[in-house]
């Protein structure tokens, strides 16, 4: 290693120290999804980031999605994917496959990646320890021609109605890193598939997490000139939605961030999961790596 490389590493470590102290014993929930999940190199970088958070005294919790993998498995089994208003319809046969892919295949892949770093990860879903209960999601869509709202029947797509933090509190006091799939039971005995973003927000809110990070395929919230906005208050976010700066698929993402803050999360970050080590850059550097939304 050259002298210049040593100096750069020393500066980075010096910059990280106060942030390590700030986040010691704090809970950070990371929603892992998007392009990063399909890239082995980015997957290994993500796992090492989570391991380093744990080694630095942080309590990291991973929540993951898996929409593309679910679609691929349904195609493989000859089951047509149905969508209503852009949302997957989950019938009884589909929800079994969703649970198999999310809580089985994907969850264990992430657990294995983190375990390969030398840390201990444990795979869970909302069913474990009665951690999460859900109910059937109530979604409506407005007809653009008649302006009349109609109710969407999405089958076994759910919304979180209750989070019991007992198991997560036990794990926080251990060496374990929870990796959670967004599948949960209802009081009616059915299994529900839950949007991973809202599931992560519910977990983070119940734990009063210091940070909730959403790893996406975009750098964060951009202004009208395409520049990254580093920080927004909830009021500013509402204003940017109203004036069209925040539009399209970013609107539900930002709305989920604001709901999480309302539930008790201290700050929510939208950042680019396609950037290697974006989690560490966000948490342990002054510049951060995405858009921070605060109360």
From Swiss-Prot:
GO MF assignments: acetylglutamate kinase activity; ATP binding
Subcellular location: Cytoplasm
Gene Ontology process terms (BP): arginine biosynthetic process via ornithine; L-arginine biosynthetic process
Keywords carried by this UniProt record: Amino-acid biosynthesis, Arginine biosynthesis, ATP-binding, Cytoplasm, Kinase, Nucleotide-binding, Transferase
Function: Catalyzes the ATP-dependent phosphorylation of N-acetyl-L-glutamate.
Similarity section: Belongs to the acetylglutamate kinase family. ArgB subfamily.
Protein name listed in UniProt: Acetylglutamate kinase
Organism this protein belongs to: Sinorhizobium fredii (strain NBRC 101917 / NGR234)
Species lineage: Bacteria, Pseudomonadati, Pseudomonadota, Alphaproteobacteria, Hyphomicrobiales
Gene: argB
